[in-house]
Each structure stands twice: as C-alpha cells, then as structure tokens.
Amino acid sequence: RASKEAAQLLLSRVYLYMQDWHNAALTAEELLKEDTRLYHMSARDSARIFLSEDNTEVLFSQGSMNFYNGMTGNRGDFAVSDSLVQLYDQENDYRRYFFGKNQSTSANSLQWKYDTIAVPHVSDIYTLRIAEGYLNLAEAYAMEDNFQGANQYLRLLRESRIRNYVHTTYTGEKLVEEIRLERRRELCFEGHRWFDLRRYAVCEKYPYSKQIRHAFNVYDGNKYEWDHTDIYVLEKNDPAYVMQIPKSVLEYDEEQMPENPRNKRSPLGDDE
C-alpha cells in the first residue's frame, strides 16, 4: 500500500500542476527530509533493468504491465524518438543504456527501462519514485527564483545519473528549461510527458508549447502486413491539447455545457 512518502510525492506533483510553487516546494521538502535515496547508476547491475522491485527509489507502484508487453508480447518494445535519444550525453549518461536497438533491423531505439519479460513487478502505468521529488522541488524553487536551491537539487540528481558530472549554474528561464529537459530524460515512459506538455503550455511565468507529429502505421488485416503510415500533427497551442468532455457528462448536464473545441485534421501527404 502507499506510504506517507508516496502521498507526499503525489501531492507535490498536484501542487506543481496547479502552479502553486510555494506548496509544491514545501511538500517536496518534507518528502526529501524523510527520504533522499537516489539510486546511483554507476552501481547499476547490467543484468538488471532500472525499474525493478530492487530499486530503492521506488516508493509505490500499482497496476499491470499492459503497456510493457500487452500489445506484442515482447519486452518493452516502444520505439524511442530520436529527439529523446539525442538529449542524453551519449558517452557519460548512464540512462542512455535504457535504450537498445531493434534486433532485426537496428533501425529504432527501443525502451528498456523496465524489467525483463520474466514477470516484472514494477508497473509502467503508475509508479512513484524519489527522483521525481528532486525534479518537483527544483522546478518549484526555480519558479520562485530560488536559483541556488533549484541548482542544488538538479545537480544532485544529475550526479547520480551522469559519469563525472560537472554542474553549470543556471538562472531564470534557462534554469527552468534545463529542469524540464531533465524531467523528460529522467521520467520518460512513466506517464508524465503528456501532462507536462499541457501544463507547460499554460504556465504563467514561462509558457512553452511545441508541435507534435504522430505516426500511425496501418496494416492489411488480411495479410498481417504493413500497408502505409499516416502522419498527424498537433500544432503549438492546438485546442486538442485539451481533452474533449465525455459524452456521458454532456448528456447528464442540465445546463448543456459547450464541448471543448477540436479541429478536424487529416493525415499529411507524402510530400509534407
């Protein structure tokens, strides 16, 4: 069951999403007074995957591994975007070893952050771990212009992830940018990215939005062969960054609230 520390971490995340930087910092501080156990990746066992039941960073995990192997029956085979792979120091960042290559084509990097195919015990759907507390506190401090505190917790996390890490001190928007990049590196495939992108877009102090391109492979159901790929684009600040209201809620509402807008879109052509 969830511990006090797990509840504190989740609460600090909620305050972060609310842009309540003061309470996000207070809650993360309380958590890290209780538990500061970052897993130093220099001591990692190459025979073990990072997120396992032996990882001391994990505070709470719940749910199955359906995202892990439910679609293909294989081990952790979600393709990793090139932009994410390139964020890591290719020589010194231990997290780079989260990603392997497709054994048949070597074309795509695949995520290998979770356990092997032999009955994993840490969920890739819902996990709370200490590293997020460091990032939550660093971000809250940076938003309150406590640059010294923000740099301290960013440095502590990076020292446990990067060989021979030498910290550069950041301030202002550049510091927030570095923390956001570190959050993407550290928490990839743990269910954070979509929520982070949406809250960045409405951040009052340092707003950020980006274009997202998604590829959908279409298969021939009769031959079980790939047919073609459709590319869809979500533009910066697109209304679709906000989910539509469920039909059941709209039908129940007596005031007939308006549906959230959603632009119609078609896949890009081959020349786009």
Model-derived regions, located:
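A contiguous binding-surface segment within folded domains or other stable secondary-structure elements
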Residues: 149, 155, 159, 163
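Structured, solvent-exposed acidic/aromatic patches
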Residues: 1-131, 143-149, 153, 172-174, ...
